Every structure is written in C-alpha cells, then in structure tokens.
C-alpha cells in the first residue's frame, strides 16, 4: 500500500529537521576535540574554544612536568590569531554563555526530535556498518560473568553498555545528555586512530608535507604547525579517487592478464596437441623409413641370390665342359703313349699318323675349349655401401622454417619503372620458394603500421630464383621490399630494404623549342644560336623576345622525379616547370602557370606569378638539381655539389606539368632519369635560403608563393 499524505508530510518534516540539526551541530563543534563545545571560552578573535581544549593546548606547549602558568599567549586554532593571557590565564578569558545556552537547547531538541522517541539525536550521530552491528558486543560495565549483551555504545565514554548499565550510568540530565549513543560497536572501531605525538588526541587532519595523519594540536603547536595540511575529507576523497582509478586500471590489467593467461593456456594445450601430432607423424615417418629399408633389404637379398644362381650355373657349365675336354684328352694321351711304345717302325708309321693328327687337332681345340677365367664371376666386385644413406639418416631431423634471406642492395638495379631485387640465403636446400613483398615508402614514422597492414603490400608468390624484377612502378619513388623464404614448416622474412626507382627520363622537345635555340642530336643540350631561323612558328613553340625557351617531351601527373641541369658558363637562365597552357611568348615564372629558379648575372631568384624572392646561392653554382614531387605538391631546387637545399614551392597541382628551360646566353645540358640523391632522401622539410626582397628585373614581386 502507498504511503498516506500525513505520513509523507511527517517524514519530509523529519528529514528537514534532521538536516537543520546536522547543519547546526557543525557550527557548535569544537575545532580541537570535534565534540560539542563544553564550557566554551570566547576568544578575542570572536572564535570559541572548549576550556579543556584550551588547557590541552597550553599543556602541549610545556615540557614534561612544567606548569602552564608562565605561558602568556597561544594561537587560535581556527584563525591563528595570537591570544594574550593575563595573570589569571584561561580564567581571564570570557565564557561564551550565549553559545552554551544554544548548545543546551540543541541537545534538548535532539532528544525530543520528530523521529521515534526510542532513537534520540545523539543516537543517530553515528551508525556502524552492518558488519559491525552483526557482531556480539558484550557490556563493558557489567560485573556479572558472563556480561550481558550491550545495547548501546557511548562514543563520548568509549564504553559499551547493556540496557541496565546504560540507565544506571547515563541518566537523562546534564552532562550525560550531550553523550553520543550508537548501536554497539567493538572497541577497536570505537577508539579510532590516535595521534602519534599526542596520545590522547584523535587524528582529524592530514599533513601533506609529511604524508601523515595528525591532530589539531600538531598543527597548532606541534612540529607540523608550518606544514601544509588538508582536511581528512579532502584527502579521503583524493586518495579514494586515486585508489579507485588505480583499482580500475589494476582490474583492467588483471583482465588483460587473464586473457593473456587464457591465450597462454590455449597455446599450451595446442603445444600438447601439436606435440602428440608430431610424435605420431614421427612414428609414421620412421615406420615408413623402416618399411622402405626392409623392402630394399629383401630386394637386394633377392638380387644377390639371383646373381649367385646365375654365376654358379655359368661356372658349372664351364666346369662340365672342362671335364669333358679333359676326359677326351686323357684317352688320346693314353693312345699316343701306347703308340710311342711301338718299336716296329712299319706298325708305328701305320698308326702314328692318325694319332698325331688327332693330338694336333686336340691340342688346337683345347685352346678354344678351355674357358677364360673371369674373376668378376667370383662376386668380388660386388659391394654394399650405404655410407651416403647412413649420413642422411644421421642428419634426420624435423623440418624448421628456413633462415631469413638477405637482400643484396648493392646488386639491385632500377629504372624509372622497374626494380630488380637480388637476395641470398644460407639455407637454400630447405627453401621451397620465395615470396617478394613491396609497398611505397612514405616515411619512417608510419613504417611499423605499414608493416602490419596487409592490404598495403603487393605480393609476388612462388619465386624459385634468388632475384626478381618488379615492373610497373612509379617513377622516382621509394619502395620497401621484403623477401620471405618459405617451406612446409613456415617462413621467415628478410630485413626491410628501401629501394627507389629512377626519375622518368626525358629529352628536349624540338617542336616546343624557340627558333633561336639549337638542340643537340641526343636532345639533352640546348644552345643559343642566332643563325638558326629556319624553324617554322607554331603555337606550341616558345616565342619570347630576348629569352629562348625549351621544354621536355613529357608531361608529369604523378610520382616523384629528379633531374639536374648543368649551366656551364651561362649567367642568365630560368629552370622550372609549367602547365601546357602557360604562355609561350613571355618569361616563364611571370604567370600563374609556371614556377622557376632563375639567375640574372649575380642575382638568383625563384619566380612564380610575376613575384620573385632572392635566394642565397654559392656564386660557383654550376649544376642545379630539380625535385618534382607531384603527389605531395612540392617543387624543390638543390645545389647537388654542396648538398644544399635552395628553395621549395608548395603547389597545388591541377594539371600535368612539363620541365621547362630558358636561357639568355650560352647553353644548358639536361641530365634526366636520375635517382634522387641520398642527401634529399629524408622526409623532413629543409630550410630554404630565400629572403623576400623586390627584384629590379620583374615588376610587382612581393612574396614567394
């Protein structure tokens, strides 16, 4: 059921009353003992202090055993005002009777407040936690054994009482009406923390300088009086906030550690699984090897037996032939010996002729019938040599990922759109293939993120050689290359190596060259030639008066390009870039479509849109480097001989640009298709040697663009 209107009003009134009483109590609390003022003194500074607290201040200022009578002054604990004492000491100060009357009325109002009669104001000033209230607290005043359970604890007396002892010791009259009664709490919670320097004082301040809990006397007359102090509440809030923040971080870290530990446990489990798998695979592979050895053993044994049978059969046939021949020869020998015993010449001649022919024939045929003995037939040239196989078996081991290859930068070559990468490896026999990865290098700062970004890398897989040529690259651009060696066990990467393509090569375009310029056969040199007037005029051709211009035969709309110009003895020239739409009948740099570095005798300037800026340049400048970074909207000029940066134009390119060259005297030679020198191979912007100043050669110059 809902609360009745009368109850709601009553509860609201009770809450308002409690709030007002708590506010009033804070005004009636002594700054030393933090209790309601008791026998308050009215100090000259208009603050008040308990008589007993003032007495403790004087006692704390004395050495042990000394009297407080010689003390003639002390400081107000609230405002630090020095209070002077007469010969009467503290008794010479006025009593704050009005404040005492207010305290008396406050205590009566606390007892007869709007809440239930069984719970007075002094009983509500301190509520123990549920953990404290659940403990069994024994009465500390009972004489019986065991003592009865306490029903209240007096904060002022610091003693817990049962109901009988409470009525006996705390009648409803002064000074007991000012005692604060709470639910029973243990003695350890009741005592609180006392000051280290003043044993009878509770801590109520925090010394920031010494990082220590102190009491009011420590700040007033103790060794902390000149230190920075803070209230316990402020320090409590700050420390609690810090602890909560650190606790949050610790909980987060514990969560991360738990996740990490879970991953480690998962890895351990995976190790167990993989180990079992590898052990099973090892047994399987070894069993297969043993099976192969057994099969080869049986096969070789069969071959030995077959060879033995074949050789013995052959030898047996030869033995039989020899035996047959021997038998015939023996018969013939016996017949011949018998004839030789015949003394009758006629009979001998009659029989010997036939025998002699047979012996001669047998002697001749025996040379044919006797077989040649081949000692190879004795199986002596047969040998079993498994030393190579034994060595392979001794080197039997599980396969590991190959050693990382190393890119040989000194062997790598480049053109304006290709780079050939060479690498070596000391582990080629265990490598099944290579993989080449590359991407555009945009600065050291983003290399780590670039390295971890899979989408930004181009990949060339399944390379079998130790070199590879990458085609279709941007001109004058730096790339990062990584080579990965791969086998069945895994892969390992080489260290990243930076390589760069050369700039786009170009030559001077005869169709755009001024009529009074002579172009060399290779298209790389231009020279002033007043006699060369045979060329016809076209809209593309430079046609300025007094200056003679030429342009390269390319239009650039991307990439980074570097070329150099050798000026030789020329003292009046302009070198830069221009849009195709730039006017051909005026000096380059005098319009918004061209940007140049120019020399006029001893003056060096950069010019754009009819504005110039002087540049500090060594007078011996004979070669000018030009770096066009179209993608980053920059055109820079350098002194390559001295590794000196001269000037950089910041340009927002909207159209393709063309290299342009103008001379007033002598000649120029172009060196194109060059790699950018290492001294300008850094991402940091270098300081230029420009200073704003009006030039006498072009009107309307105020600043460098």
Curated annotation (Swiss-Prot):
Binding site for Zn(2+): 195, 198, 218, 224
EC numbers on record: 2.3.2.27
Zinc finger (B box-type): 137-184, 190-232
Keywords of this entry: Coiled coil, Cytoplasm, Cytoskeleton, Metal-binding, Microtubule, Phosphoprotein, Repeat, Transferase, Ubl conjugation pathway, Zinc, Zinc-finger
UniProt-listed InterPro entries: B30.2/SPRY, B30.2/SPRY_sf, Bbox_C, Butyrophylin_SPRY, ConA-like_dom_sf, COS_domain, E3_ligase_FN3/SPRY, FN3_dom
Coiled coil: 233-301
Enzyme class name: transferase
Subcellular location field: Cytoplasm; Cytoplasm, Cytoskeleton
Gene3D superfamilies cross-referenced by the UniProt entry: 2.60.120.920, 4.10.830.40, Classic Zinc Finger, Immunoglobulins, Zinc/RING finger domain, C3HC4 (zinc finger)
Predominant localisation class: cytoplasm
Record note on modification: Phosphorylated on serine and threonine residues.
GO biological process: positive regulation of autophagy; protein ubiquitination
Zinc finger RING-type: from-to: 30-80
Alphabetized GO MF terms: transferase activity; zinc ion binding
Assembly description: Homodimer or heterodimer with MID1. Interacts with IGBP1.
Family of this protein: Belongs to the TRIM/RBCC family.
Role, per record: E3 ubiquitin ligase that plays a role in microtubule stabilization. Mediates the 'Lys-48'-linked polyubiquitination of LRRK2 to drive its localization to microtubules and its proteasomal degradation in neurons. This ubiquitination inhibits LRRK2 kinase activation by RAB29.
Designated name of the protein: Probable E3 ubiquitin-protein ligase MID2
Source organism of this protein record: Mus musculus (Mouse)
